[in-house]
Regions:
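Alpha-helix initiation/capping motif
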Residues: 1-2, 17, 67-68, 96, ...
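Residue-level signal for pocket-adjacent positions within structured domains
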Residues: 9, 16, 90, 118, ...
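Conserved C-terminal helix/tail region of periplasmic/extracytoplasmic solute-binding proteins
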Residues: 97-136
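Secondary-structure end/capping motifs
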Residues: 23-110
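Short beta-strand->loop
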Residues: 1-9
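A bilobed periplasmic-binding-protein/Venus flytrap-type ligand-binding module shared by bacterial periplasmic
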Residues: 11-26
Length: 136
């Protein structure tokens, strides 16, 4: 995995333009906890969601092959190897500032992007999280 080599990205993190964070704060305050809980619910019982995904893959017939067995394996592996896990603070979906800084350092070095003008706090926020939602 890429993370095994030091690039511990936040896979599929919700992104919002910084100019929109304040203006969409009410929406984000409602949406983010729903997304947190959905991840926990899926981790605890993926059967209904996996069934729907497999059904839609077949229905849309885009060439992607995804079986019920593959869905179950992906779910189980995600939990087993820590791809799906609470943040270092025990909250589902939280960002760790040191981890964000590490990602910024890698992007700066290898992508030639000047990240020195930004801080982890400017790049990611835990502002809209419900601290009570976790895998426990």
């Amino acid at each position: 995995m890429v993370a095994d080599n030091g690039y511990e990205e936040y896979f599929q993190a919700l992104s919002v333009r910084s100019d929109d964070v304040e203006g969409q704060a009410d929406c984000l305050s409602a949406l983010v906890p729903v997304m947190q809980q959905a991840q926990v619910d899926y981790a605890e019982d993926p059967s209904e969601t996996n069934e729907l995904i497999v059904e839609l893959v077949e229905e849309y017939d885009t060439g992607w092959v995804y079986t019920a067995e593959a869905a179950e394996y992906a779910h189980d592996q995600g939990l087993e190897i820590g791809i799906v896990a609470d943040g270092s603070d025990g909250v589902m979906g939280s960002f760790d500032e040191a981890r964000v800084q590490g990602l910024m350092d890698i992007v700066g070095e290898y992508a030639g992007v000047d990240t020195a003008a930004f801080t982890p706090e400017e790049m990611a926020t835990n502002q809209f999280l419900d601290d009570s939602i976790s895998l426990g």
